[in-house]
Design a protein with these regions (language model features):
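Ser/Thr-centered, proline-biased regulatory motifs
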Residues: 30-36
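Amphipathic C-terminal alpha-helical segment
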Residues: 158-177, 192-203
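Short hydrophobic/aromatic patch on the recognition helix
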Residues: 41-52
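N-terminal intrinsically disordered/low-complexity leader segments
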Residues: 1-11, 81, 201-205
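An amphipathic alpha-helix adjacent to DNA-recognition modules
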Residues: 10-18, 25, 30, 51-75, ...
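Amphipathic alpha-helical segments used for helix-helix packing
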Residues: 101-119, 136, 167-175
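Hydrophobic alpha-helical connector segments
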Residues: 75-104, 145-148, 154-158
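Amphipathic alpha-helical packing segments from all-alpha helical-bundle domains
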Residues: 118-144, 152-157, 184-195
Length: 205
């Protein structure tokens, strides 16, 4: 591993992000420290703050990479599933599969809390916005008359519900035996929601 004068600031940022991502993947967010990141890249802990404001900023960028990875897993699904219900089910299943395959990276998205003095940057909000746009696409096919505000609320409502099932299922808090049953609960949720949307149930905005 090179020393400080061997890497530019951008290169140092990339090294830190990659190392932090690997630590979170293997040990979870609770296992991440600045000292571990520094050790992994061969620098002193203080050098990290040449590239980042603090450890929270490093985590934010790792979580951004996770959102980008998840987006790549789902972005093509609506175009491959002409039936909007099938598309919604496939999106939910892809989300659950990602959580199963990358549990620590996935949990980090929701476990990490920024300090009050550090608002979410625009680039991170843009990553979440495009995720919800993918979810909204089949819902807008089901109910074309939705306003943009209704579409946003509908996609967030469905995705939040799917996340709840995934989270409780992976933590074994649903009192169900195996992953197949988690998929069954997920399917029941999505089908019920989509049918309600198709039936014209009111969307509060």
């Amino acid at each position: 591993m090179g020393r400080r004068n061997d890497h530019s600031r951008d290169e140092l940022r990339e090294l830190c992000e990659n190392a932090a991502g690997e630590i979170i993947q293997s040990e979870g967010l609770g296992g991440l420290t600045a000292r571990k990141v520094a050790s992994a890249i061969g620098y002193s802990p203080g050098t990290l703050y040449v590239a980042f404001q603090n450890l929270d900023e490093i985590i934010l960028h790792v979580n951004g990479e996770t959102l980008a990875d998840l987006y790549e897993c789902i972005r093509l699904i609506p175009g491959l599933k002409p039936d909007p219900l099938e598309a919604a089910l496939a999106l939910a299943n892809a989300y659950l599969q990602y959580a199963v395959e990358h549990p620590n990276r996935w949990r980090s998205l929701f476990e990490h809390r920024l300090p009050p003095s550090m608002p979410l940057p625009d680039w991170f909000n843009a990553l979440t916005t495009r995720m919800f746009a993918v979810v909204a696409e089949p819902l807008e096919r089901i109910r074309p008359a939705m306003t943009p505000e209704e579409s946003l609320v509908a996609s967030r409502a469905l995705w939040s519900s799917v996340h709840g099932v995934a989270s409780l299922g992976l933590d074994s808090k649903l009192e169900i035996d195996d992953r197949a049953n988690v998929h069954h609960v997920m399917q029941l949720l999505v089908v019920s929601y989509v049918r309600g949307l198709a039936a014209g149930e009111e969307i509060a905005t």
